[in-house]
Design a protein with these regions (language model features):
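Membrane-integrated ABC transporters
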Residues: 1-24, 41-66, 80, 84-88, ...
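Transmembrane helix-loop-helix hairpins at lipid-water interfaces of multipass membrane proteins
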Residues: 11-83, 155-187, 261-282, 288
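Juxtamembrane helix-loop junctions of ABC transporter transmembrane domains
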Residues: 27-31, 73-116, 120, 183-188, ...
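Extended non-transmembrane interhelical loops and adjacent amphipathic helices
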Residues: 89-135, 197-240, 312-325, 455, ...
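Pre-NBD coupling/linker segments of ABC/ABC-like ATPases
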Residues: 138-141, 208-225, 244, 322-340, ...
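Cytosolic ends of transmembrane helices, especially the final helix of ABC transmembrane type-1 domains
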Residues: 222, 246, 266, 287-323
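ABC-type nucleotide-binding domain
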Residues: 330, 335-591
Length: 591
């Protein structure tokens, strides 16, 4: 994962840290040699008087060489340390970019059903956090590599004097490692178990202080309710976290105390050996320094290892997310989408219910959408109209029956090509905090640089009138999320969304409640243009307003997940069935 982010930086980081790892023991060994040389020179029977005499005598040449070597190593250590910090910051930034891009790409490949599943949302939330929260783990891994080499070099020096010193030091620190691993696992289990509550807590914090909800929070006085609910969840999490940390504090303090006793036992042995003359002052300096550094390094390694093991538990959430595979994908021998579509789209006894739901969203659904025809779907909320659109665009696959495009199952076609052939605008379209041009260009993002195409799509949707009023025109940032942004009315946003569908220039055009936020005149103009511009295309229109669907070639009445009746407006009114009943109910509001 790190290598994939930046091979060059990763290799440079490893080499720099390997060089830096052997510098401490080298400097300490040279320090020992300097002390021994000073003691030797001080014990000479005849010694030069002044510094210049020492220099001229040549007796201090070796000492001068040692001091110069130590100075060189000190300067090299400082320089390499700065290079390591520089490379580490760059590598971490590259890893953030690499992981974030990979997460976005993988999320785009997953099924819509995954995003509508609460369990998946918990996993996605944990994965998002790991792309940022665990990035320091890279630096810790590299530091562990460096410290491991340094420990090996110091350990080799201690073993040369007495192997038991290293063994004693390692045994003293093992209980600390075990204890740290235990508490890391406890904290991870707590965070994993409370992921749904954390998502709710973050959601409450977001809606309590965001522009989208600010009006209702103020008007309905929701601040106290949201604040108290947030505090309740946060305090619950805090209480459990505090209990675990209290236990960790007590246990780890005891284990660390035991390790300290072992350390000072070994230190007393070194002093005793020096007093008996078995070790020189230089040896004492080297051994005490090595033992002190080695104790700190091993303790740091064990702590870092336990910390990394704890963080690796969290990274497992990221890997699990990447392991998820979509159920909806292109077959190995995928067919190209016919150009043009000749016969149309047929629903044959289609049944579907959403994951985890007992009620069928659509059942025994059969109808034919002929090529070049405009069909309107009408019906009450929950009848299954939007589900039909999701099935048509293969956001879901039917559990029963099949959907045919020119006589072949939709599942036989290349998925990307199929979705490129269908332009859909849902009633809950996205309001992108981008420029007006980019809001339209998202309909066919590969043509983002084609400003003429964007202008043409805007004109078709009457969005050009909206954009003409903006100070910066097509380059104006829309939405209030960023400083330069200007918010739009619901109807203005809707025109931008409709322009997005025209930008796609797809063979099949689907508008799901496209004019819900438009006034009657604007709606009439949009549908007139839609009728004119959809000539030669296959179009599916969903609307609650019966005045809007009259222009369709055919109207299908959807109820309880199946087509109850179909025909032209006049035919359906004449039959005095469900369509006539709904039409009359709506018409009463205008009388």
């Amino acid at each position: 994962m790190v290598w994939r982010a930046s091979p060059g930086l990763t290799l440079a980081m490893i080499l720099l840290r390997l060089v830096r790892a052997v510098l401490p023991v080298s400097m300490l060994w040279i320090g020992k040699l300097i002390i021994d040389e000073v003691v030797r020179l001080g014990a000479l029977q005849t010694r030069p008087e002044g510094v210049s005499d020492w220099w001229q005598s040549g007796l201090a040449d070796y000492l001068g060489l040692l001091i110069a070597a130590e100075l060189g190593l000190a300067l090299a250590s400082d320089l390499i340390g700065r290079l390591v910090g520089y490379a580490d910051s760059l590598l971490q930034e590259r890893l953030v970019i690499s992981l974030s891009v990979r997460l976005m790409d993988h999320a785009a490949d997953l099924d819509l059903a995954s995003f509508e599943d609460a369990g998946f949302q918990d996993r996605l939330d944990r994965a998002r956090r790991q792309t940022m929260g665990r990035i320091p783990l890279v630096g810790q891994m590299m530091q562990q590599l460096q410290d491991g080499v340094t420990v090996a070099s110091f350990g080799a020096g201690l073993i040369a004097y007495n192997p038991w010193l290293v063994i004693l030091l390692a045994v003293a620190l093992i209980p600390t490692l075990i204890g740290q691993l235990h508490f890391n696992a406890m904290l991870y289990q707590m965070n994993w178990r409370r992921a749904p509550e954390r998502r709710e807590r973050d959601y409450l914090r977001m809606i309590g202080a965001t522009s989208e909800s600010a009006k209702e929070v103020k008007i309905f006085g929701l601040n106290r309710f949201l604040r108290d609910r947030y505090r309740e969840l946060a305090e619950r999490f805090y209480a459990e976290n505090r209990a675990i940390n209290r236990r960790q504090l007590a246990v780890m303090a005891a284990l660390t105390g035991i390790g300290t006793l072992f350390y000072y036992g070994a230190y007393l042995w070194i002093i005793a050996r020096t007093l008996t003359g078995a070790l020189s002052l230089g040896d004492l300096t080297f051994l005490s320094g090595s033992f002190l550094r080695l104790r700190g390094l091993i303790e740091g390694l064990l702590t870092s290892f336990s910390d990394m093991a704890g963080q690796a538990l969290y990274l497992d959430d990221l890997y699990r997310f990447f392991d998820e595979v979509p159920a909806i994908a292109s077959p190995a021998d995928a067919l190209p989408v016919p150009l043009p579509i000749r016969h149309g789209i047929t629903f044959e006894d289609v049944g579907f219910r959403y994951p985890g739901a007992e009620r069928w969203a659509v059942r025994h659904l059969s109808f034919h959408l002929r090529a070049g025809e405009t069909v309107a779907l009408v019906g009450e909320n929950g009848a299954g109209k939007t589900t039909i659109v999701k099935l048509l665009s293969r956001l879901y696959d039917p559990a029963e029956g099949r959907i045919l495009l020119d006589g072949r199952d939709l599942r036989d076609y290349d998925l990307d090509a199929l979705r490129a052939a269908i332009g859909v605008i849902f009633q809950d379209f996205v309001r992108y905090a981008m420029s007006a041009a980019d809001n339209i260009a998202t309909g066919r993002i590969e043509a983002r640089a084609d400003r003429d195409r964007i202008r043409a799509a805007a004109a078709r949707a009457l969005a050009d009138q909206v954009i003409a009023k903006l100070p910066e025109g097509y380059d104006q940032m829309v939405g209030k999320r960023f400083a330069r942004g200007l918010d739009l009315s619901g109807g203005e946003w809707q025109k931008l969304a409709i322009a997005r569908a025209y930008m796609r220039d797809a063979q099949v055009l689907v508008l799901d409640e496209p004019t819900a936020a438009l006034d009657a005149r604007a709606e009439f103009e949009v549908f007139q243009r839609f009728k004119d511009l959809s000539q030669g295309r296959t179009a599916l229109l969903i609307s609650h307003r019966f005045s809007s669907v009259r222009m369709a070639d055919r109207i299908a009445v959807v109820e309880d997940g199946h087509v109850l009746d179909e025909g032209t407006h006049d035919e359906l009114v004449a039959r005095e069935g469900r369509y006539r009943e709904l039409f009359d109910l709506q018409a009463q509001g205008y009388r």
